[in-house]
Amino acid sequence: MAITRGAKVRIKRPESYWFNEVGTVASIDTSGIRYPVVVRFEKVNYSGLQGVDGGINTNNFAEAELEPA
């Protein structure tokens, strides 16, 4: 199955903060880069400063690291 923009996907990269979480495909790069799929999540990761709203809620993945949710 081809991943398309707006699709809900589950992350299968074990070292990822979002492993087994569901996110939405924000964009897909077709230029041949290693991690072409940008996935957006509802929650942010741990890189935000303590006591300050922030953090990252997107990450790039390869299509092989994603499965439809």
Swiss-Prot record:
Keywords: Membrane, Photosynthesis, Photosystem I, Thylakoid
Keyword Membrane: yes
Topology of the protein relative to the lipid bilayer: Peripheral membrane protein
Main location as per UniProt: membrane
GO CC terms: photosystem I reaction center; plasma membrane-derived thylakoid membrane
Signal peptide: none
Intracellular or extracellular location(s): Cellular thylakoid membrane
Domain of life according to the entry: Bacteria
GO biological process: photosynthesis
Main function: Stabilizes the interaction between PsaC and the PSI core, assists the docking of the ferredoxin to PSI and interacts with ferredoxin-NADP oxidoreductase.
Family: Belongs to the PsaE family.
The protein, known as: Photosystem I reaction center subunit IV
Species this chain originates from: Synechococcus sp. (strain CC9605)
Lineage: Bacteria, Bacillati, Cyanobacteriota, Cyanophyceae, Synechococcales
Gene: psaE
